């Protein structure tokens, strides 16, 4: 009996912790299944959105104040922007969320294509939210 009560308390704690993290996510992220692979602060299957925001907002940045992982990804994104003729990191991130794929982040599972299942306006709104997490 004691074991059951302890298990129930632990389960309730996990549910509450997950719901707090999920509440921070925009409704669009929950509605479109983004939270299955992403959170704002921690890597799940894909990178944490705050890390994505830092890297994409630091494209072209230099100096020792930049986190090495963020710097490495931002350098990759800079090269990708040139290679694909994208004018802004936002344009590339919108394409990445729409079409899926791998290549920007290290040791992550490939992102599934989200378009046309997720509306273009929703993708743009989510990208705006992600990039807004860490402004330059």
Question: Where are these predicted regions, by residue range?
Answer:
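Sequence/structural segment immediately N-terminal to covalent heme-attachment motifs in c-type
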Residues: 23-40, 55
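Sec/Tat signal peptide C-region and signal peptidase I cleavage site
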Residues: 15-22
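Axial heme c-ligation environment in periplasmic c-type cytochrome domains
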Residues: 36, 42-56, 68-124
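Bacterial N-terminal signal peptides that target proteins for export
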Residues: 1-8
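Short, solvent-exposed mixed-charge patches
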Residues: 135-136
């Amino acid at each position: 009996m004691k074991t059951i009560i302890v298990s129930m308390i632990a389960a309730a704690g996990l549910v509450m912790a997950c719901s707090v993290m999920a509440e921070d996510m925009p409704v669009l992220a929950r509605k479109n299944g983004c939270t299955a692979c992403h959170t704002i602060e921690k890597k799940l299957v894909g990178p944490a959105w705050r890390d994505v925001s830092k890297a994409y907002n630091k494209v072209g940045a230099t100096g020792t104040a930049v986190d090495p992982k963020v710097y490495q990804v931002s350098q990759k994104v800079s090269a990708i922007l040139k290679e694909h003729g994208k004018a802004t990191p936002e344009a590339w991130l919108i394409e990445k969320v729409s079409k899926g794929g791998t290549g920007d982040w290290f040791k992550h599972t490939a992102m599934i294509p989200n378009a046309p299942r997720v509306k273009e306006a929703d993708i743009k709104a989510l990208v705006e939210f992600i990039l807004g997490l860490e402004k330059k």
